[in-house]
């Protein structure tokens, strides 16, 4: 579930006392859930009159929403905070105030240490308490240095405002919606259970209400998010037990919601109902991100994945049997402690058998506090890097082959945003690819029939199907 740093902005709103709005700059690192969290923090800040800026220099509040998955994540944050300290000092000399906040998983993991190492920081707030951000800022303005990383007893989503339709519309025709947080799997390489906590599922009514609000605001495609999204569970209208598949069936009933996706999944939680949803729901896109991490049973056991390579392959076979056009994505780690050449070759064999449309791969990075950090037989960095290079070459080859296999196909394309060229829009294919096509800006949000004509580095090209020769 990875994404490069992104900027998200709070919606516009004037202060309750009628004075000029304050400016907020939010920088988001990491996964899609952090992107979603930044959006919800923006909505919460809007109630206190914070409006967006893309210029950090003019911000009254700079908020870093951080990620802790990779090695040196914290050091990158401290480096950014060093630059912000100088900016804050310069503004103070000019008689201007700037507050600095750190949110997200580094905030959760580091807590008070952030205030010790970065004295310019005013607020540190965790991913389970960001609904209390406005109050934390008020306390900071009174001179307190605030750390709020305790797991909240109350449901944060009940305390967060939902944006108005006009603000949702300004954000685009696709949206994220968090339905589940935390993880109970305790893979030995992963910090998520320690930074996001145990698995928690949002109630059906809350999810449906938010989805309906998004659709009212012009959203055509919703991606359901969770650290382990297919572990979501809840109660149906008669109190019956629901799993993610049931939730997808319910959301597919919302008028105007054309497309559904979900990420990130664990193989152990792909149940029959969810597989049936892939078979039955036209709105559920034929794309599945299903991380496996390794093709070696020995390494999978050391990772505490609790499934074998054969079980993963069998699951893929079952899914493809009901949805032959589904495209697979995955995550892989090279150089996990104890990984031998044979273990790595097992991973390559699994990749060859699955044939991914795209995948994400990383060198193993030691995360303090995880069981993996205590394992012996740590793999040398040069071997990790060499294996990663080989794996990525294979995955890139498969991605290119999948893209080329799309040439000549007619597909339904959701038009999302302007392209780089005049008269061009960028749309999203059912398989999550960016597709360039000539279309009018007024068509953003439409789903049109196109024919794929070619491939680019990270995108496809298409023409309107009715205009195709």
UniProtKB/Swiss-Prot annotation:
Subunit note: Monomer.
Organism: Rhizobium etli (strain ATCC 51251 / DSM 11541 / JCM 21823 / NBRC 15573 / CFN 42)
The protein's role, per its UniProt record: Catalyzes the methylthiolation of N6-(dimethylallyl)adenosine (i(6)A), leading to the formation of 2-methylthio-N6-(dimethylallyl)adenosine (ms(2)i(6)A) at position 37 in tRNAs that read codons beginning with uridine.
Phylogenetic lineage: Bacteria, Pseudomonadati, Pseudomonadota, Alphaproteobacteria, Hyphomicrobiales
Cofactor binding note: Binds 2 [4Fe-4S] clusters. One cluster is coordinated with 3 cysteines and an exchangeable S-adenosyl-L-methionine.
UniProt: [4Fe-4S] cluster 2 binding residues: 183, 187, 190
Entries under SUPFAM superfamilies matching the protein: Radical SAM enzymes
Stored InterPro entries: Elp3/MiaA/NifB-like_rSAM, Methylthiotransferase, Methylthiotransferase_CS, Methylthiotransferase_N, Methylthiotransferase_N_sf, MiaB_methiolase, rSAM, rSAM_horseshoe
Location of the MTTase N-terminal domain: 22-142
PROSITE patterns on file: MTTASE_N (PS51449), MTTASE_RADICAL (PS01278), RADICAL_SAM (PS51918), TRAM (PS50926)
Keywords, comma-separated and alphabetical: 4Fe-4S, Cytoplasm, Iron, Iron-sulfur, Metal-binding, S-adenosyl-L-methionine, Transferase, tRNA processing
Compartmental location: Cytoplasm
Pfam families: Radical_SAM, TRAM, UPF0004
GO cellular component terms, semicolon-separated: cytosol
The protein's name in its UniProt record: tRNA-2-methylthio-N(6)-dimethylallyladenosine synthase
Cofactors named for this entry: [4Fe-4S] cluster
Disulfide bond positions: none
Catalytic activity: N(6)-dimethylallyladenosine(37) in tRNA + (sulfur carrier)-SH + AH2 + 2 S-adenosyl-L-methionine = 2-methylsulfanyl-N(6)-dimethylallyladenosine(37) in tRNA + (sulfur carrier)-H + 5'-deoxyadenosine + L-methionine + A + S-adenosyl-L-homocysteine + 2 H(+)
């Amino acid at each position: 579930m990875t994404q490069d740093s992104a900027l998200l902005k709070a919606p516009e709103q004037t202060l309750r006392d009628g004075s000029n709005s304050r400016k907020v700059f939010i920088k988001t690192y990491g996964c899609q859930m952090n992107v979603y969290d930044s959006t919800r923090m923006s909505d919460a800040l809007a109630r206190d009159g914070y409006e967006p800026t893309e210029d950090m220099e003019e911000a009254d509040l700079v908020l870093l929403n951080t990620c802790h998955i990779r090695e040196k994540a914290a050091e990158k944050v401290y480096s950014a905070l060093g630059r912000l300290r100088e900016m804050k000092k310069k503004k103070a000399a000019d008689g201007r105030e700037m507050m600095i906040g750190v949110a997200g998983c580094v905030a959760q993991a580091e807590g008070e240490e952030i205030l010790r190492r970065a004295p310019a920081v005013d607020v540190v707030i965790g991913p389970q308490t960001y609904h209390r951000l406005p109050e934390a800022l008020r306390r900071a303005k009174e001179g307190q240095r605030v750390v709020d990383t305790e797991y909240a007893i109350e449901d944060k989503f009940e305390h967060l405002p939902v944006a108005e339709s006009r603000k949702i519309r300004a954000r685009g025709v696709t949206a994220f919606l968090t339905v589940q947080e935390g993880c109970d799997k305790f893979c030995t390489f992963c910090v998520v259970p320690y930074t996001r906590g145990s698995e928690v599922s949002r109630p059906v009514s809350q999810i449906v209400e938010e989805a309906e609000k998004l659709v009212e605001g012009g959203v055509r495609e919703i991606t359901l998010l969770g650290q382990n999204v297919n572990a979501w569970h809840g109660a149906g209208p008669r109190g019956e037990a629901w799993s993610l598949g049931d939730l997808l069936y319910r959301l597919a009933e919302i008028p105007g919601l054309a497309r559904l996706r979900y990420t990130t999944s664990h193989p152990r939680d792909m149940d029959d109902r969810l597989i049936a949803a892939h078979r039955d729901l036209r709105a559920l896109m034929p794309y599945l991100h299903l991380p496996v991490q390794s093709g070696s049973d020995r390494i999978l056991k050391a990772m505490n994945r609790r499934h074998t390579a054969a079980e993963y392959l069998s699951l893929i076979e079952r899914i493809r049997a009901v949805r032959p056009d589904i495209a697979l994505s995955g995550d892989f780690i090279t150089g996990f402690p104890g990984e031998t050449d044979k273990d790595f070759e097992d991973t390559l064999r699994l990749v060859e058998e699955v044939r991914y449309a795209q995948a994400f791969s990383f060198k193993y990075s030691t995360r303090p506090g995880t069981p993996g950090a205590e394992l012996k037989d740590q793999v040398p960095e040069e071997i990790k890097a060499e294996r990663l290079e080989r794996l990525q070459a294979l995955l890139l080859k498969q991605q290119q082959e999948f893209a080329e296999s799309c040439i000549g196909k007619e597909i339904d394309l959701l038009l999302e945003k302007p392209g780089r060229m005049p008269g061009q829009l960028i749309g999203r294919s059912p398989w999550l690819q960016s597709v360039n096509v000539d279309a009018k800006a007024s068509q953003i949000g439409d789903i049109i029939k196109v024919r794929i004509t070619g491939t680019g580095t990270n995108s496809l090209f298409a023409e309107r199907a009715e205009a195709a020769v």
